[in-house]
Amino acid sequence: MNSCKRFPRSARICLRSEYYVAFEQGRRYSSVLLRLHHLPTSGPVRLGLVVSRRVDIRAVNRNRIKRALREVMRQIAYKLVPGDYVVVVRQTAKDVSNAELSVALLSLLRRIGALPLAPIDNAMLPFFERNCSRK
């Protein structure tokens, strides 16, 4: 894989102590599939993932979930507010698709204000261009 397409190690939370700081000092936000701990910092965007064996006993499935979430963060990291983001995956995420995981993570990030809201289609077009279908 091309190195520019990877999620760099410097953008990951690796140490147990860093996870504890995010858990204890960060704000917590929840959805049905994920729980997000956000700790604003002055440094770069960093991601930590927690997928326990309770989610799925098979490592293959846990790794699939982590890869999917890491890929979403890689694609949007430049848009995010700087800070540490720790994503804890819930048991309900075991049988969902990668697309559903992506939507769940993006909606949590929008809810906390770390990611700008999605643009509304045709928001900048004049009223008559939105509602008329001329041919």
UniProtKB/Swiss-Prot annotation:
GO biological process, one term: tRNA 5'-leader removal
Protein origin, superkingdom: Bacteria
Disulfide bonds: none
Enzyme class label: hydrolase
Pfam families linked: Ribonuclease_P
Cellular component terms per the entry's GO annotation: ribonuclease P complex
SUPFAM superfamilies registered for this protein in UniProt: Ribosomal protein S5 domain 2-like
Gene3D superfamilies listed in its UniProt record: 3.30.230.10
Enzyme Commission numbers on file: 3.1.26.5
Catalysed reactions, semicolon-separated: Endonucleolytic cleavage of RNA, removing 5'-extranucleotides from tRNA precursor
GO terms of molecular function: 3'-tRNA processing endoribonuclease activity; ribonuclease P activity; tRNA binding
Keywords: Endonuclease, Hydrolase, Nuclease, RNA-binding, tRNA processing
Complex and partners: Consists of a catalytic RNA component (M1 or rnpB) and a protein subunit.
Family as reported in the entry's similarity comment: Belongs to the RnpA family.
Function: RNaseP catalyzes the removal of the 5'-leader sequence from pre-tRNA to produce the mature 5'-terminus. It can also cleave other RNA substrates such as 4.5S RNA. The protein component plays an auxiliary but essential role in vivo by binding to the 5'-leader sequence and broadening the substrate specificity of the ribozyme.
HAMAP family: RNase_P
Protein name: Ribonuclease P protein component
Source organism phylogeny: Bacteria, Pseudomonadati, Pseudomonadota, Gammaproteobacteria, Lysobacterales
